[in-house]
Amino acid sequence: MKFIILGFFLLSSMYAQEIKDHSFENGKIIYQQTCVSCHGKSGSTNPYMQLVVKPRKLSKTILTQEQSFQITKEGAHFWGAHSDLMPTFKYVFTDSELEDVSYYIAKAFNPDREKKIQKLLDESDSISKEDQSKMLKTGEKIFNRNCSMCHGMSGNGQSEYVEQSKAQKNFIYPYDLRRTLLTEEQIFLYAKYGGKYWGTMKDDMPSWKNKYDDFILKSVAKYVNEKIKTVK
């Protein structure tokens, strides 16, 4: 009986691996036929592309595999981007095909993402129970004083500063945070380390770790996640 169970387990494992291998290869084919022209063979993007907003480096993305799938399916604009550079592909490929692409990107370009993010979270300051009760109020204060200059008071990515940047031909495209896919932890890490650390080609979203401590940045992330973000 033990041999039968062991044999079944081995066959199941082999079948599961075969499915993963097929998903990887199919995702690779689609990526090379469709995505490579913007994101490059290694997912690091061609920095010489003549675009106002250049594609992100997939090798540094903060996104999970599921989040990458959602971005690819619906397009970046659906999830808060004010640039339509990353279009929707749901009318071109099936969900299964887009899941294969996301799987390929995760395994080929960013296999250590989870370890990297967990390490950064483990190294961040923990928040005491006493301070946790102050987070939303603190986050709102800092957001209104600092983040709203680009993202707007409501977090919609529209502000006077953004309009001035257009007039000066120095375009910036703050996200509509009401629709962001990022979790509270991801928002914290994105604010702490800045956009370039996570693969953007411009530094419109700077690192705030030298100005604010982890308590303040985690408070802002909590405020955005609970009070601004409308897509859960």
Where are these regions (language model features)?
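The canonical Cys-X-X-Cys-His
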Residues: 27-41, 101, 139, 143-154, ...
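Extracytoplasmic electron-transfer domains, predominantly the class I c-type cytochrome c fold
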Residues: 52-108, 164-227
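Short, non-ligating residues that shape and space the ligands of small metal-coordination modules
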Residues: 44-45, 156-157
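Sec-dependent N-terminal signal peptides
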Residues: 3-12
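Conserved catalytic-core motifs of eukaryotic protein kinase domains, centered on the activation segment
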Residues: 48-50, 160-162
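The C-terminal output helix
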Residues: 108-114, 228-232
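Extended amphipathic alpha-helical interaction segments
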Residues: 126-138, 149-152, 159, 170
